[in-house]
Swiss-Prot record:
Classification via Gene3D superfamilies: Acetylglutamate kinase-like
Entry's EC annotation: 2.7.2.8
SUPFAM superfamilies: Carbamate kinase-like
First-tier enzyme category under EC: transferase
Pfam families documented for this protein: AA_kinase (PF00696)
GO cellular component: cytoplasm
Protein name stated in the entry: Acetylglutamate kinase
Source domain of life: Bacteria
Biological process according to GO: arginine biosynthetic process via ornithine; L-arginine biosynthetic process
CDD domains membership: AAK_NAGK-C
Role: Catalyzes the ATP-dependent phosphorylation of N-acetyl-L-glutamate.
NCBIfam families hit by this protein: argB (TIGR00761)
Length: 279
């Protein structure tokens, strides 16, 4: 009997959060191990399907860096990085578009199998993500100048769950590879999302990454600004994205460990949460 009561308590604990976030836009940046491990991938898709089916409005922006690198190697296309960003010449950009499109359609299929009306897009569809060249040395890597959010608003209104590949375009319809974190942040800001969640390969934000006891479960925007200069590496960039989002209309940003099964549900629908909440 006790185990049944525990299950009931889990549902009761989730109820106020389901009510609070009903009809709210939730932007999920999907990447890392949660994309590469089939069991984790299925858990993430289940989480997102549940978010949708209980009344939230999730949108997915996905990465695909490791798959792009593997395909470049297979096809003999040179792939190099500068400051953590892939140098994207014409050939590399074509490979990235192909791989991201393949990933996108697989995600659509996974969610449709869970009863969700999912639809796949890239940033060139309907000029969703308009961008300019980020740096001449990076070739066709784009910085987003405009998000045509009306497309997404109309899809949400029609009960679709948009899944977006981070490919953009300039005014001449040239194709650009866009960092998936940047794309997720820009879209969340344009839609003034209730939440932006980054699925990562770390437990969250650490005050000192070498001290695993220094995990920060919650941090205000002002505290995040003070901490940001002290953080190094990829998490520094991630925290800057969190600050940018919170300063531009996104209510809360979450840094979650995508290696933990059902981390999205644990963060959004439980009192303790998991990972780091910014804002």
């Amino acid at each position: 009997m006790q185990k049944y009561l525990e299950k009931a308590n889990v549902l009761i604990e989730a109820l106020p959060y389901i009510r609070k976030f009903n009809s709210k836009i939730i932007l999920i940046k999907y990447g890392g191990s949660a994309m590469e491990n089939e069991e984790l991938k299925h858990c993430v898709m289940q989480d997102i399907a549940l978010l949708k089916l209980v009344g939230l409005k999730p949108i997915i922006v996905h990465g695909g860096g490791k798959d792009i690198s593997a395909m470049c190697e297979k096809l003999g296309v040179k792939s190099e990085f500068k400051n953590g960003l892939r140098v994207s010449d014409k050939a590399t950009t074509e490979v990235a578009s192909m791989v991201l499109n393949h990933i996108n359609k697989n995600l659509v299929h996974s969610l449709q199998n869970l009863g969700v009306k999912a639809i796949g897009l890239c940033g060139k569809d309907g000029a969703l993500l308009e961008c300019v060249k980020k740096d001449e040395n990076l070739a066709f890597v784009g910085t987003i100048q405009k998000v045509n959010s009306k497309i997404l608003e109309e899809l949400l209104e029609k009960d679709f769950l948009p899944i977006i590949a981070p490919i953009g375009m300039d005014e001449d319809f040239n194709t650009y590879n866009i960092n998936a974190d940047d794309a997720a942040c820009a879209i969340a800001k344009a839609l003034r999302a209730e939440k932006l969640a980054f699925l990562t390969d770390t437990a969250g934000l650490y005050e000192d990454f070498n001290d695993k006891n220094s995990l920060i479960s919650k941090i205000s925007l002002e505290q995040a600004k003070i901490l940001a200069p002290k953080i190094e590496g990829g998490m520094h960039v991630k925290l800057k994205s969190c600050i940018d989002a919170c300063e531009n209309g996104v209510k809360k940003v979450h840094i979650l460990d995508g290696r933990v099964k059902h981390s999205l549900l644990l963060e959004f629908f439980t009192d303790e949460g998991i990972g780091t909440l910014v804002g």
